[in-house]
A protein has these predicted regions:
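Ordered alpha/beta subdomains of enzyme catalytic regions
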Residues: 1-217
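Conserved small/polar residues in nucleotide/adenosyl-binding loops
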Residues: 222-223
Length: 223
């Protein structure tokens, strides 16, 4: 995982603390939020699997170090320190799918000052995005408790990763399946789908498009 997935000020603060000899101080960070999304009354926690992968693989490779060196704002000794950076602390979190409220700690981070600073941006990115999707999914499930709900967010996601992990978050929120084939394979999510307008446009008559689809996929109800 690219160690540059962070904000510049996290690195400059860590650089300055390193120069002062304060970079290995033990700290505890609590992560919480101030306002529920969608003007709602709760939030659904999601993102912990993604977060775990992010933390376990967060490191700086040679290209990362060379880029940071080119910025000419970091001490050489700090860049040497980053070459071997690995998270060695502990993270405690509320289970995924839990209903939480503003001001409650969702995650508690035990580590060094440097670890907390370098990882904070990525942790926030992951939990903010996936908890948002899970919360929306739960709100939809609440008003449609007996309906089959399918997640089709890939084509409007803000990038590949958002589409992949967003599909998983929707399942945490209560959806039944996803159109995202990669998410189905990776996370064991049921893959679902209908058909696109391009299929209908491939036929002279609309009814023929529907009949042919039913003929080829016998699990569909033919009427």
């Amino acid at each position: 995982m690219n160690g540059l997935i962070t904000d510049l000020y996290q690195l400059t603060m860590a650089n300055a603390l390193f120069n002062k000899g304060r970079h290995e101080r033990k700290v505890v960070f609590d992560r919480f939020y101030r306002k529920n999304p969608f003007n709602g009354g709760y939030t659904i926690v999601a993102g912990l699997e993604h977060l775990q992968q992010f933390v376990e693989n967060f490191r700086f490779d040679e290209e990362d170090i060379n880029y940071l060196e080119s910025l000419q704002i970091f001490y050489p000794a700090f860049l040497d320190y980053l070459k071997d950076f690995r998270f060695k602390g502990d993270i405690y979190a509320v289970p995924e799918g839990t209903v939480v409220f503003p001001g409650e700690p969702l995650l508690r981070f035990h580590g060094t000052t440097t670890e907390a600073m370098l990882l904070e941006t990525g942790l926030s990115m992951i939990m903010n995005h996936e908890s948002l999707i899970a919360t929306k999914a739960r709100r939809v499930r609440t008003v449609a408790p007996r309906d089959a709900l399918m997640e089709f967010g890939l084509r409007r996601a803000q990038g590949h990763s958002a589409g992949l992990w967003g599909a998983r978050a929707a399942m945490i929120g209560g959806f039944n399946g996803t159109s995202n084939v990669e998410a189905g394979k990776r996370f064991g999510i049921p893959v679902l789908g209908t058909m696109a307008h391009s299929w209908v446009m491939s036929f002279d008559e609309e009814i023929d498009a529907f009949r042919e689809y039913v003929r080829q996929y016998h699990c569909l109800l033919y009427t």
